[in-house]
């Protein structure tokens, strides 16, 4: 990194819940265990507006530079880096874990996690996020991307992506973690609920890329039809089916029976769906030794068919985000063209237009990035 450059432009929140401002701040320095990344594009989560205005009540310290998953280039290396090189294109994995306590986890720039260790990490060394020209990132959270494969022209064997397109990896890697944890295999059948949100539709896309048949289960039939249309480039006839949630467990089970045997159920439902009939119905529809991935946002306990789970040897697997190994596995799938990124170019916004970016992501659900 050029030594003459001392300051950078960054979004900054002084007080929790207050509007962000663009400030000139000192560029961070690389220290042991860290990398300085020049941010090319930082992802805007669909509900990011309600994170930083305080409505979601996500815990995080202030003052803070917001921003989470991103793509950028290595600008400066810490003294203990052995494989990364200045100029390398990297995906910034926002799931930061303690090095001496891997159960201490927080989401970079967004959420301080659920342990004292996670809070310590976010309040200290790794407080500031990616809505800035430069960001200080743990070495292990910088996943290299093969730029020639991903961004090279199709005539030369590349995939033809723009660098900002690669931010979509962040959306796809979340459900990839849950699907890998339940060992979804090619040719198997998985129920995905609810498939119409950002991460739900990503789960459908990822499961298809993994070679599974998907039953997309949602409340709104017209939105399910939209999912089918969106997934057309990623599938073929017979690999994506839909079931509309009826409100009756018995009816839902009956509607799922035609697709048996069903190997797995992936749930990423929001808290608003906590009383939905689909949850119990999907579990009841699984084959012997079926698996359940729980990645949803339920804040209260939900009833489960205990007897059936016991007698059918059903496995329940909770997953929060994904592991470092899974990040690299997912990137390899994308580099080889098996896991395709969003079919449309991301909407780009400057730092000053952060409010417009948040609103656009919130109202459209489409891929949105801030380009510092």
Sequence positions of predicted segments:
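NAD(P)H dinucleotide-binding glycine-rich loop of Rossmann-like/cofactor-binding domains
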Residues: 97-191
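Residue-level marker of beta-strand positions
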Residues: 88-89, 134, 189, 209, ...
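Residues in the short beta-alpha loop(s) of Rossmann-like NAD(P)-binding domains
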Residues: 220, 298, 322
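C-terminal hydrophobic helical "lid"/dimerization subdomain
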Residues: 2-6, 177, 277-280, 324-372
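Glycine-rich beta-strand-centered segment in the early N-terminal region that forms part
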Residues: 26-43, 55-107
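Mid-domain Rossmann-like dinucleotide-binding core that forms the NAD(H)/NADP(H) cofactor-binding site
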Residues: 152, 156-247
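Glycine-rich cofactor phosphate-binding loops and adjacent beta1-alpha1 units
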Residues: 182-184, 208, 215, 224-225, ...
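Rossmann-fold dehydrogenase core element
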Residues: 236-238, 290-293, 304-343, 366
